[in-house]
Amino acid sequence: MILFPAIDLKEGQCVRLVEGRMDSATVYSNDPGSMARLWQDQGAQYIHVVDLDGAFAGQPRNRQSIAQIVQGVQVPVQVGGGIRDLETIEDLLSLGVDRVILGSAAILKPELVAEACRKYGQRILLGIDAKDGQVAIQGWGETVKRTALDLALEMKQLGIERAVFTDIRRDGKLSGPNLAATGELARNSGLRVIASGGVASLEDIRQLKKLEQDGVEGAILGKALYTNAVKLPEALVIARGEESVC
């Protein structure tokens, strides 16, 4: 299982939010590039970046910080937040971003998802952000009458093979991931799923590891790392199935 340290960008700073609320931001670093290197040095195989300003604005706002992150590490980087046209996708990939995540665009512009998948294949991921079972878009500020599974199946038909699934109610709260919903989505959609939201302990990672057989291939770690609730090297041992930690 792959663990993705998260770097959430707000005005060029690394922050964490609670339930996606911008007024809840806690700043952890003013240097996103060095934060990415820190996680790489601790063993990260992949970095997950979210442009929070972009998610709310509908277009990327932290391009320079994203470039610093990509240029500062040797591991691949995936980026989401405000990516709603092909030009933005191409720009991010030209910076060296490995994969881009389309969230609101899946609802607002499904034709973009289809075109991007045709052009870039597995470099395009679906971002499913759910609140109380309903998909949320536009920086999580609006819910639509669509379930996570409905959206996953629709996007699978357009070429999507992998999705990041975030339970908004758990994001930034260290309350544990929504194991049931994550496992069900992977099983019933046939997509490879990366879990996001609520991971708070090594035990949470153990439980997510058990869902690998259902198609859960990774987990995003945010606040747990920044508050030292979870130490990345120990978490990676569990993710690799080399359990002798704790």
Curated annotation (Swiss-Prot):
The active site is at D8, D129. InterPro entries: Aldolase_TIM, His_biosynth, HisA_bact_arch, Isoase_HisA-like, Isoase_HisA-like_bact, RibuloseP-bd_barrel. It catalyses: 1-(5-phospho-beta-D-ribosyl)-5-[(5-phospho-beta-D-ribosylamino)methylideneamino]imidazole-4-carboxamide = 5-[(5-phospho-1-deoxy-D-ribulos-1-ylimino)methylamino]-1-(5-phospho-beta-D-ribosyl)imidazole-4-carboxamide. One of its GO terms (cellular component) is cytoplasm. Keywords: Amino-acid biosynthesis, Cytoplasm, Histidine biosynthesis, Isomerase. Its EC number is 5.3.1.16. HAMAP family: HisA. This is 1-(5-phosphoribosyl)-5-[(5-phosphoribosylamino)methylideneamino] imidazole-4-carboxamide isomerase. It comes from Desulforamulus reducens (strain ATCC BAA-1160 / DSM 100696 / MI-1) (Desulfotomaculum reducens). The gene is hisA.
